């Protein structure tokens, strides 16, 4: 594999298994959500998203996407309920997006791709820290939210406006007082299944919770995502687009729905 993993022809998702053999594992993500096969599970609880005390710290271009990082030293922004046992603490969120509006999401719904997908990453507090949590089958809970292009999402604009300052790999900026509640849709109806990180090391530690209702963002907002760079400053420009892993085999897994 050339150099390091990425999304290009020579280091993209079809090559990842060479360095990360779990890429061909039994609970890989993302997957296609077949709405006709997903089974309504009346025992699933409503999701509890408590982000009112969230403390954002920083935004970082890591050369694969950009992460908005949170203070996870206390139970400030937590996810509970739904398919989860216990409390999961928000550590960061990031997006995956396309070069065109017709692709970009990682999960698909009846094979439909959205323009982008938001991942809010939480770790199970019973494991003490994120690094230990990723070693456990129930270590992480990732809330996945689809983005479609339409009217602007006001709650996203603060993110969009800072992207100029983190154009290239390794750049970061202070990013405080951001309220992630502004990125949620009205409905918290969801699908859930056991899966993995969608980027190397692809660890099989994630309870996925994918919301049925997409959020709407404007074409101008998503265009700003596409102006970011995979490369570092002073290197040849490679636009940060199509940073998504395609759907993986469902294998022996059942996707459950919280709604009829």
Swiss-Prot record:
Q: Which residues form the active site?
A: 64 (proton donor/acceptor)
Result, substituting residue 119 to E: Strongly reduced activity
Q: Where are the transmembrane segments?
A: none
Q: Tell me which cofactor or cofactors this protein depends on.
A: Zn(2+); Co(2+)
* Effect ascribed to mutating residue 106 to A/Q: Strongly reduced CO(2) hydrase activity
UniProt keyword Acetylation present: yes
Query: What pH behaviour does activity show?
Result: Optimum pH is 6-8.
* Effect on the protein upon substituting residue 198 to A/C/H/P: Strongly reduced activity
- Write down the chemical reaction(s) this protein catalyses: hydrogencarbonate + H(+) = CO2 + H2O; urea = cyanamide + H2O
A Pfam family reported for this protein in Swiss-Prot or TrEMBL:
Carb_anhydrase
**What is stated about the way this protein's activity is regulated?**
Activated by X-ray, histamine, L-adrenaline, L- and D-phenylalanine, L- and D-histidine, L-His-OMe and beta-Ala-His (carnosine).
Outcome of substituting residue 198 to S/V:
Reduced activity
Question: What's this protein's function?
Answer: Catalyzes the reversible hydration of carbon dioxide. Can also hydrate cyanamide to urea. Stimulates the chloride-bicarbonate exchange activity of SLC26A6. Essential for bone resorption and osteoclast differentiation. Involved in the regulation of fluid secretion into the anterior chamber of the eye. Contributes to intracellular pH regulation in the duodenal upper villous epithelium during proton-coupled peptide absorption.
Q: Which disease relates to this protein according to its record?
A: Osteopetrosis, autosomal recessive 3: A rare genetic disease characterized by abnormally dense bone, due to defective resorption of immature bone. Osteopetrosis occurs in two forms: a severe autosomal recessive form occurring in utero, infancy, or childhood, and a benign autosomal dominant form occurring in adolescence or adulthood. Recessive osteopetrosis commonly manifests in early infancy with macrocephaly, feeding difficulties, evolving blindness and deafness, bone marrow failure, severe anemia, and hepatosplenomegaly.
The family assignment reads: Belongs to the alpha-carbonic anhydrase family.
Question: Per its record, how is this protein called by name?
Answer: Carbonic anhydrase 2
What gene does the UniProt entry assign to this protein?
Answer: CA2
């Amino acid at each position: 594999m050339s150099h390091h993993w990425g999304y290009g022809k020579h280091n993209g998702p079809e090559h990842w298994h060479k360095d990360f053999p779990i890429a061909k594992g039994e609970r890989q993500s993302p997957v296609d959500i077949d709405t006709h096969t997903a089974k309504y599970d009346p025992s699933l609880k409503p999701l509890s998203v408590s982000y009112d005390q969230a403390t954002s710290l920083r935004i970082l271009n890591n050369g694969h996407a950009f992460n908005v990082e949170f203070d996870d030293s206390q139970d400030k922004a937590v996810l509970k309920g739904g398919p989860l046992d216990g409390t999961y603490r928000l550590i960061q969120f990031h997006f995956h997006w396309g070069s065109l509006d017709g692709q970009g999401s990682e999960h698909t719904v009846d094979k439909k791709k959205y323009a982008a997908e938001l991942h809010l990453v939480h770790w199970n507090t019973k494991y003490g820290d994120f690094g230990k949590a990723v070693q456990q089958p129930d270590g992480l809970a990732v809330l996945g939210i689809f983005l479609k292009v339409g009217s602007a999402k006001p709650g996203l604009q603060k993110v969009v406006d800072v992207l100029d300052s983190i154009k290239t790999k390794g750049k970061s900026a202070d990013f405080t007082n951001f309220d992630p509640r502004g990125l949620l849709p009205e409905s918290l109806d969801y699908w859930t299944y056991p899966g993995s990180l969608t980027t190397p090391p692809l660890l099989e530690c994630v309870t996925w919770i994918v919301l049925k209702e997409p959020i709407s963002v404007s074409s101008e907002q998503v265009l700003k995502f596409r102006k970011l760079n995979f490369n570092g400053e002073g290197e040849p420009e490679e636009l940060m687009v199509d940073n998504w892993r395609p759907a993986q085999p469902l294998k022996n897994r059942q996707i459950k729905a919280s709604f009829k």
